[in-house]
Amino acid sequence: MGPPREARRSEVLRTLRSLEPELRAEGVRHVSVFGSVARGEDTVASDVDLALDLAPSSVPTGFQFVVYIDRLKRRLAAALSRNVDIVILPARRPELKEALSREAIPAF
């Protein structure tokens, strides 16, 4: 069955905070959790929805941006032992903006 939802959310936040120095070195300024994990509605099979605020000077462009995001996504998924979905801030889709304003829990 796995740990209770609040324990899973706390573990996700703890893990993200432990990665802060590494992520900041990669150009990540802030990370927030949103979606089912933030709402406490996740299951052990749920992915983790993360919103990343990136330092523009650290972010590659073109195809290298895709490689950069893929590397971040794989690193985060490995650390969290769960699939990860990433939204890059600022969110442009209205429904994402709304979800983030309602649900986002900052990790750092």
Describe the role of every protein-language-model region.
Residues 1-30, 38-40, 44, 57-108:
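Catalytic core of pol beta-like nucleotidyltransferases
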Residues 53-55:
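Residue-level recognition of strand-loop junctions within catalytic nucleotide-signaling folds
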